Amino acid sequence: GRMSRKLVALFLGVMLVFVALAIDITYVNATKGEKYERQVLSQTQQSYDSRTIPFQRGSITDRNGTILATSEKVYNVILDCKLANTTVKDEEKNDTHPYVDPTVAALVEYFGLDETDIRDRLTGETTKESQYQVLAREVSMDAKKAFEAYVDEYADKKNKELDENEQAEKAYRANIRGVWFEESYHRTYPLNSLACDLIGFTYSGDTADWGIEGYYSSILNGVNGRQFGYYNEDADMEQTIIEAQPGKNVVTTIDVNIQKIIRTAIENYNERIHVQNGADESDTETNRQTKAAKNIGVVVMDPNNGEILGMDSSDWYDLNNPRDLTPFYSQEEIDAMNDNETMEALSAIWKNYCISDAYEPGSTAKPMNVAAAYSLDVIDDNTLFDCEGFETIAGQMIRCGAYPGTHGVQTPADVLKNSCNAGMMQIGQKMGAAEFLRYQDIFGFGSLTGIDLPGEAYGLVHTEDTMGPTELATSTFGQGYTVTMVQQAAAFSSLINGGNYYQPHVMKTITDSTGAVVESNEPNLVRQTVSAEISDKMRSFLQGVVTDGSGQSAKVAGYTMGGKTGTAQKYPRGNGKYLVSFIGFAPVENPKAVVYAIVEEPDVENQANSVLAQEIVKEIYTELLPYLNVFPDDTDGVTGEGSETGTDDPNVAAPVQEDDTENSAENSNIENGGLTNAELDLINEE
């Protein structure tokens, strides 16, 4: 009946499922059965029969192929206790262990291992049968070869070729058993501390948090391989090897030669200041290596594509020994630190000052603000600004650097050349808060640049809600908001390259283990900040700063150069602490490199002296420009001797006092530009 037909149909359906399943199993067994069988069998083997084959982490090089970080092959010394403990009957049929003493002696002699530890492993209840005891890690290839040469010295020689003593030695060394070597890799940094902030370092296990090592860690890492054994149907051990896949290599935009130029300039600054302060001139190394300021930072950038050519700060640590605090603290200070304090001290050293620290830029911000005013058509070349030495804003006096003198009537070019705060405040009033903030955003302030390095800070800028007349006034000359060095360098580059804002970056290409390029980091044009016409104008204005204005000490004879000085009081105002800076470009007609230097709290009596930063930039350009195949042209008519005043006002004949700098104000609350103490502390922590 109908029920019988349903049962038959159900039965046939079930049978079809089983037939299909059987066919599938047969197919899998025929095509992949051996692979799966090996994997299952391998799970039952001891670690001696199944081990990880480590990958080789990719290298980091500079743009010319100089190795900055690489992984060298090293070896772990493994002892097969079971084999070394093999029992052999002597002539009297007694059990002996002839392999133990020769093996232990050789391990102690060639690897400096502890004899007691080895013997404890050979006799311990949980280890004496072990076939995998790691005795030493990361021994060199030379050490491995020396051990193997000792073991094999007589192995291929016949006894008749040896005298009696040599025959005995051959028999003795033949009893060295159970020692084998497991390949591993050790990360090494051939240039030690050079570019340490940029490169970063790895922890154990090829993990990293800092620098290029951290940002590109997943690219640099490869995939571990595996060697595993299994017993076949004849109970014979067979080995299968899945080779490790090496990591990719990162070719950076950095040029080691430029990095060395930067380092030398910072060292020369350190030595110069220490000797001026009475240090022993003969103690050259200490004078050069000990920073003569709270912080010093330098960025060298190609303004035409965003490539970072060099970047350095003054906390130099050895990438091969990054936890060594002795260059920075006394042993007593180190011993007194708890774990948290030690980690805080290390983190402060490891961070990249040029991207992680935000600060008030001071007058190096003025060129961007003048360019913004031109873009808004609120000023032109004929607009005049009358500097009376101060401006009264919202009932408060805010001084210019010329106070109690004046700069008089000035054009926009004069305002920049003289670094006149009064003129800048008048420009800010013409712009208005909303447009001023819009152009801060266009130039990238308050936003991440997106540089391919970890730990970049945002900086802190005002909003329309927090920017009143006073905040606008102080912001025009670079106080009351914060930036990072890389933000400032990228914004300034766009100002002088035709108005093109390129994303700063440190990776040029990524290559595989054969050297083939698998990824190229093409210049990323993010936006247009100003027109090409305004960019041309700003280059001309900034050239005037170097030839006739506050930046004369940065001038290199025979070259056309432009730039801007900065002297910013640190909070709280009036404490005598300053951050001085200079940002420059050369040559003016076709800029090849932007160089930006900061000296934070220099170790001098009068910190308000931008010449300290100008001298660093001048020294860098003196070496950098010929290296970039830019050669002197003496037709510019400038000697390059520079200004001796050390101020940002060429009309001031002597070094300014603490309250007479370009960014001084009468009221510290006004100087703060509306930022609270807590906000400024937060910025400094970033």
Residue ranges with predicted function:
Residues 69, 75, 231-241, 296-599, ...:
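Beta-lactam-recognizing serine transpeptidase/beta-lactamase-like catalytic domain environment
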Residues 1-331, 434-441, 555, 573, ...:
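Periplasmic/cell-envelope proteins involved in peptidoglycan metabolism and beta-lactam response
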